[in-house]
């Protein structure tokens, strides 16, 4: 009997792994997983600093999202399209000293960009036919997206 239960459980684990259903199990309810990170789009509009503070309160290691490639950008844009009426949102890229030295709020490497124009804090805009980034004064209020690394031990 114990062996039958073990076999059934093993088959369930294999099924969930292959179906992708288990992929989101490391993220809290309401968050979505992509490439070992959890993401959540927040609709209430906040300025960049307030948005970053809210992200940091959500989960250990959570910050405004850093984007490192077109696949990640497409994933975040799908989340935004589902969650927001107006698909403009803060991401973690900023120029805090206004010296053209851009950095991610989570200290990730600045290795991908999709600029529309320049300086200060960065908004990602999702349109039906394109995705682009542009800079905006950090005091402006828009929606935002948070991100954190999942715990592989969970």
Curated annotation (Swiss-Prot):
Gene Ontology molecular function: toxin activity
S-S pairs: 27-38, 55-146, 121-138
Keywords annotated in UniProt: Disulfide bond, Glycoprotein, Hemostasis impairing toxin, Platelet aggregation inhibiting toxin, Secreted, Signal, Toxin
Transmembrane segments: none
GO-annotated cellular components: extracellular region
Residues the record marks as site: Key residue for binding with integrin: 88, 118, 127, 140-141
Cellular compartment(s): Secreted
Keyword Protease carried by entry: no
Domain C-type lectin: 34-147
Matching PANTHER family: MANNOSE, PHOSPHOLIPASE, LECTIN RECEPTOR RELATED (PTHR22803)
Function of the protein: EMS16 is a potent and selective inhibitor of alpha-2/beta-1 (ITGA2/ITGB1) integrin and acts as a potent antagonist of platelet aggregation and cell migration. Binds specifically to the I domain of the alpha-2 subunit, in a metal ion-independent fashion.
Protein name: Snaclec EMS16 subunit beta
Organism name: Echis multisquamatus (Central Asian sand viper)
């Amino acid at each position: 009997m114990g062996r039958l239960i073990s076999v059934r459980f093993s088959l369930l684990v294999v099924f969930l792994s292959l179906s992708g259903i288990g992929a989101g199990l490391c993220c809290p309810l309401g968050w979505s997983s992509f490439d070992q990170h959890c993401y959540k789009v927040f609709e209430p509009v906040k300025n960049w600093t307030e948005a970053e503070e809210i992200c940091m309160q959500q989960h250990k290691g959570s910050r405004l999202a850093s984007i490192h490639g077109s696949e990640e950008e497409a994933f975040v844009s799908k989340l935004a399209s589902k969650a927001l009426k107006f698909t403009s949102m803060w991401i973690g890229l900023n120029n805090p000293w206004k010296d053209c030295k851009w950095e991610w709020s989570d200290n990730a490497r600045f290795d991908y960009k999709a600029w529309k124009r320049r300086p200060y804090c960065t908004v990602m805009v999702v349109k039906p036919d394109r995705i682009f980034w542009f800079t905006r004064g950090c005091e402006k209020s828009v929606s935002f997206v948070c991100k954190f690394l999942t715990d592989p031990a969970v």
